[in-house]
Swiss-Prot record:
Alphabetical list of Pfam families matching this protein: GATase (PF00117)
GO function term, MF aspect, one: imidazoleglycerol-phosphate synthase activity
Gene: hisH
Subunit comment: Heterodimer of HisH and HisF.
Superkingdom of origin: Bacteria
GO BP terms in the entry: L-histidine biosynthetic process
Protein's recorded name: Imidazole glycerol phosphate synthase subunit HisH
Amino acid sequence: MIAIIDYGMGNIRSVEQALKYIGAAYIVTSDKEEIFRSDGVILPGVGAFPKAMDILEEKDLVRVLQEIGRSRKPLLGICLGMQLLFEKSEELQDCNGLSLLPGVIRKLKVPYKIPHMGWNELKKEGEIALWNGVEDGSFVYYVHSYYADCPNEIVYGISDYGVKVPGFVAKGNIYGAQFHPEKSGDIGMQILKNFKGVVETWKSSQLSI
């Protein structure tokens, strides 16, 4: 069972539809016990970083997500949800994030339209389980005005928008997509299927303990 975190700022409906399409069992929840009982977690998000962190704090979900991230349970952040995984953001004001990944969220300063909205090429950097069946140079769908300034060793996908935008990051059990896999057609569905596979592998490992 995959828990989709419901904190009032997520693109939950489209994530739900995507998981339903790939045959993944899921629950939409903000209940701490349900999140801990899940086999994997998706943190979606649309909106402002500081407001999102305030809501997560109010719901006591900061601690929960940090515990999930520091365990071996698979965690996938999408768009703002990915940004929240980092140490802090410069959006509106300096604001601390979940600090599960090293790096800072900075505003895009490019000679192009902001937000970066629409399809862009994703160049793979290295191989991870979520790249199974995903071709290098596939196009994915973005909507964002901020990007992750983070170490190269956690970047597994890059798109060019005047700067090198980390489109996909990963470290251990933690994954983050700056783009929207749930809106990225067949490629996005394949990435979510791969995440489902990682979740199932983790679940099997727990049953054997």
